[in-house]
Structures are given as structure tokens and as C-alpha cells.
A protein has these predicted regions:
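Paired small-residue
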Residues: 3-11, 193-201
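Cytoplasmic helix-loop-helix junction between adjacent transmembrane helices
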Residues: 8-46
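Helix-loop-helix hairpin linking two adjacent transmembrane segments in secondary transporters
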Residues: 42-86
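Small-residue (Gly/Pro/Ala) motifs that create kinks and tight helix-helix packing interfaces
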Residues: 50-62, 130, 244-252
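Structural signature of the two symmetry-related core transmembrane helices
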Residues: 75, 170-185
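C-terminal membrane-cytosol helix-exit motif in multi-pass small-molecule transporters
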Residues: 75-93, 274-279
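Extracytoplasmic gate region of multi-pass secondary transporters
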Residues: 110-145
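Helix-to-loop junctions at the C-terminal end of transmembrane segments
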Residues: 155-168, 252-253
Length: 293
């Protein structure tokens, strides 16, 4: 029934949230907080890689065994993940009194806002690039999405140590600049190749935004609160992607599809200004966080 389907989606969302945050912090506990940027980057690579493979594999499973076969396959994959995780040594929890949620939110919300603003570019590419190509009368929207994915994953693979070398806020500002150029190219594209270059640059720019800001956000709290900080920080991206679609749809019906990419570039520019302010006047936090900027 619809009720069971909705309940299943809620449970799936809760489980996915714990799995994503927990696995990231597990990795940080294994390799140390110095490499938190690389851990977040690799977590994103395997997550988006699984999503990319999941769609075609899901179609094959559905064709082979129907909806029940698909459900059993997904449960089998989840069970395999549990079996692989069980024999691995546990990570010792950090002792100390945890901060209340309000205090954690107060330390990470500015970084979350910058992430939310920058996520608008990702949202309009993923949701509206097909409509954009259709409005222009062009072919190749699927290839444009492929370019975005390749640029996203490729940038993380090519620059694994960039955050440690330059600092999270510096990397974020560079990424914002690249993302802005990409969105402006898409919004003003008169030829398909301009749009494809713009999509490629947007993927490159957005790739390191999450780990770059996440490093600083997580280190703004004591170690025993880093799980709560990462979860809170991630919510800003989820909320941004949730509202980007409807709002961009309203703008599109009023002013046309290209305008939403120009508007997204403006939001990313706001993220750039906010991050520059955080760089010049960092909020009161732990000394470790200030050194990561």
C-alpha cells in the first residue's frame, strides 16, 4: 500500500543518513582528522559511483526478477555491507561531554549556508539540463550529465591533497569561482559546446565544495561532536536540493530556462562572498578549526 511504501522510504532515508555519516566518521577515526578532507572526498566518490551504477543495474534486476527480485537484490547488497563491516576493528569513541545540538548548529551553520548556496548550481544542472537542451532545440543532454559526473569524480581523484595543502576555505573559494564561470557559460550558451564546457566546469567547481567546507565545519567542534557536526552540515545541502527544484521551476516559467543558471551563479557568488568573510573573520571556534581555513 501507499502507507507501507511511504514508511519504507522514511526508514530507508534514516538508514542512509546514518550509513553516510557513520562511514565517514569511521574512516576519520581510522586515518585521523588530518585526512578528513580525503575521507569525505572518497566517501562522495563511492556514493555517487554507486548511484551511477545502481540505476542501470536496477533496471536489469527488475527485468530479471520484477519488483520482488529488485528488492531482494537491494537487501542482499545491504546485508553484504554489514557482513563486510562486522569483522573490521571498531574505532574508539572520543570521551568528553558532548555539546548540545544548538551549540553545534551555531558553529557550523555559516559553513552550511555556503554549502547550501553552492548546491543550487548542482541542483539546476541535475534537474533542468534536459529541459534546457530541449528549449534550445539541441541534442546531447544525457552526454552533458555524463560530463558533469566525470568532472565531479575526476576532480576529486586528481586533487586528493588539495584541501590539506591550501586549506578548506581557500579550496572552497577557488571551487566557487570555477562553478560560477560554468553556470554563466550554461546560462549564456549560444552553441551546444558552450553549454557542455559550462556543465563540465560546474561539475569541477562543485566537486570539492562539500569536503572543503566540511573539513572546517567538522573541526569547529570537539572530536566527540564531529558526528553531529557532519550530520548538521549535510542537512544544509539536502535542504538546498529540496527547495532548488520548485523555486527554479517557478523562475523558469516566469523568465525562461537559461535564467535559472544565471540565478544559480548569483547564489554561488553569495557563497563565495560568505566564505571570503569566514576567511577574513572566522567565527569563534576551536583553534584546530582556524588552522584548517
Amino acid at each position: 500500500s501507499l502507507l507501507l511504501l511511504g514508511l519504507g522510504r522514511v526508514i530507508l532515508g534514516i538508514g542512509q543518513s546514518f550509513a553516510g555519516t557513520g562511514s565517514t566518521l569511521w574512516g576519520v577515526g581510522v586515518v585521523g582528522s588530518l585526512h578528513i578532507g580525503r575521507v569525505i572526498s572518497w566517501n562522495g566518490i563511492v556514493t555517487y559511483g554507486a548511484m551511477a551504477m545502481g540505476a542501470p543495474l536496477g533496471v536489469l534486476c527488475y527485468a530479471w526478477g520484477g519488483l520482488q527480485g529488485l528488492a531482494l537484490t537491494v537487501m542482499g547488497v545491504a546485508l553484504l555491507a554489514i557482513l563486510l563491516a562486522l569483522p573490521r576493528p571498531s574505532v574508539k569513541a572520543n570521551k568528553g561531554k558532548p555539546l548540545p545540538f544548538r551549540a553545534v548548529l551555531g558553529r557550523v551553520w555559516l559553513y552550511g549556508m555556503a554549502l547550501a548556496l553552492a548546491s543550487a548550481g548542482f541542483g539546476v544542472i541535475a534537474t533542468f539540463i534536459t529541459l534546457f537542451y530541449d528549449a534550445k532545440g539541441w541534442d546531447g543532454a544525457a552526454f552533458a550529465l555524463t560530463l558533469f559526473s566525470v568532472a565531479f569524480v575526476g576532480t576529486r581523484l586528481l586533487f586528493p591533497n588539495g584541501i590539506n595543502r591550501l586549506g578548506g576555505l581557500n579550496v572552497a573559494m577557488i571551487c566557487f569561482g570555477v562553478e560560477i564561470i560554468g553556470l554563466l557559460l550554461v546560462g549564456t550558451a549560444a552553441m551546444p559546446w558552450m553549454a557542455k564546457i559550462g556543465v563540465l566546469l560546474t561539475g569541477m567547481g562543485f566537486s570539492l565544495v562539500f569536503p572543503a567546507l566540511g573539513v572546517v565545519a567538522v573541526k569547529a567542534v570537539p572530536p566527540q561532536n564531529q558526528g553531529a557536526a557532519l550530520a548538521t552540515y549535510t542537512v544544509f545541502m539536502d535542504m538546498s536540493l529540496g527547495v532548488t527544484g520548485p523555486l527554479a521551476g517557478l523562475v523558469m516559467t516566469w523568465a525562461g530556462v537559461p535564467v535559472i543558471y544565471l540565478a544559480a551563479a548569483g547564489l554561488v557568488a553569495m557563497a563565495l562572498l560568505l566564505t571570503w568573510r569566514l576567511k577574513k573573520r572566522p567565527p569563534s571556534a576551536l583553534p584546530e578549526a582556524a588552522s584548517s581555513s
